C-alpha cells in the first residue's frame, strides 16, 4: 500500500518537481496537486491523505500548517516564513494531536551538512556572519536556512562573542541580527540558493559555502522527510535531526 501524499503548491517550480519525484517513487501516491484556489482541508478529507508537502508562500504557510495538522495529516513544510513563535505553536499542536511533522528550512542534504559543519566550527571561532543569496522571486528575507543556521550556531557556541560598537553610516549596512548573529541577504538574478557562513579569529578566517544550482538537489530531502514523518509523533524542525 502506497503512502497517500498531497502536494500543496504543486504548480510552482518546486511543486512540479516534487510531484514528479513522488509519483515516480514506489512508496508514494500523489493523491492531489493543489494550488491557491483549492480547499486544502477538504482535499485532505476527500483523499484521506497521510502527508501534505507544503511548498507554497510565506504569507500562508502557518495557516496551511494548522489546517494540515487539524485535519489529521502529517505536515512536511518546505515553505520559509515561519517565525519561532509559530513553530512553537505548531509543535504544541502536533504534541496534542500525537501527529508527526517536519519543518525543513532546506531540503538539500548538502545544505544540511553545511549547517551542521557551521555549528561545529562555531565552537572554535568567536566571530561569525552569514551571507545568503536567492533568486528574486523569493520575497522573504532572511531565508529560513539562514535563520536555522544562526540558531544552530547560537546553540553550539562556547566562546564569547563581541558586539562591535560600530556606527552604521547607512541603516542596515551590517545586516539583520538573529540570535546576535548578523545575516546579510542578497536577491539577484542568476542565483537559485546560496549561503556562506564566514568565521573569523585573530589571523584567520574560515568560510563554509553551499550552492544550490538546480532544484533537483532538494528532491532527496523531500523523499527522506516523507519517509521519516510517518514514524514521528512530534514536530521536527530541521532535517539534521533525521540524518
Regions found by a protein language model. Give the residues of each.
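C-terminal substrate-binding/catalytic lobe of Rossmann-fold NAD(P)-dependent oxidoreductases
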Residues: 3-47, 126-243
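Structural motif
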Residues: 8, 55-56, 78-79, 104, ...
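Rossmann-fold dehydrogenase core element
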Residues: 74, 89-108, 126-128
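Rossmann-fold NAD(P)-binding glycine/threonine-rich loop
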Residues: 79-101, 117-120
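Rossmann-like NAD(P)H-binding beta-loop-alpha module
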Residues: 113-125, 141
Amino acid at each position: 500500500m502506497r503512502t497517500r501524499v498531497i502536494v500543496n503548491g504543486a504548480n510552482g517550480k518546486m511543486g512540479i518537481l516534487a510531484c514528479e519525484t513522488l509519483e515516480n517513487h514506489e512508496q508514494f501516491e500523489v493523491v492531489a496537486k493543489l494550488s491557491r484556489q483549492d480547499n486544502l482541508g477538504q482535499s485532505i478529507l476527500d483523499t484521506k491523505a497521510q502527508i501534505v508537502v507544503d511548498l507554497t508562500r510565506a504569507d500562508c504557510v502557518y495557516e496551511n500548517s494548522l489546517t494540515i495538522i487539524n485535519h489529521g495529516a502529517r505536515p512536511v513544510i518546505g515553505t520559509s516564513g515561519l517565525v519561532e513563535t509559530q513553530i512553537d505553536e505548531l509543535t504544541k499542536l502536533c504534541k496534542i494531536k500525537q501527529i508527526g511533522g517536519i519543518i525543513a528550512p532546506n531540503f538539500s542534504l548538502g545544505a544540511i551538512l553545511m549547517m551542521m559543519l557551521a555549528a561545529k566550527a562555531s565552537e572554535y571561532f568567536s566571530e561569525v556572519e552569514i551571507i545568503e543569496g536567492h533568486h528574486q522571486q523569493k520575497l522573504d528575507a532572511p531565508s529560513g536556512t539562514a535563520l536555522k543556521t544562526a540558531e544552530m550556531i547560537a546553540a553550539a557556541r562556547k566562546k564569547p562573542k563581541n558586539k562591535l560598537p560600530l556606527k552604521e553610516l547607512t541603516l542596515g549596512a551590517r545586516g539583520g541580527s538573529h540570535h546576535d548573529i548578523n545575516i546579510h541577504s542578497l536577491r539577484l538574478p542568476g542565483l537559485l540558493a546560496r549561503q556562506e557562513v564566514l568565521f573569523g579569529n585573530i589571523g584567520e578566517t574560515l568560510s563554509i559555502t553551499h550552492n544550490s544550482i538546480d532544484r533537483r538537489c532538494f528532491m532527496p530531502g523531500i523523499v527522506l522527510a516523507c519517509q521519516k514523518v510517518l514514524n514521528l509523533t512530534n514536530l521536527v524542525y530541521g532535517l539534521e535531526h533525521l540524518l
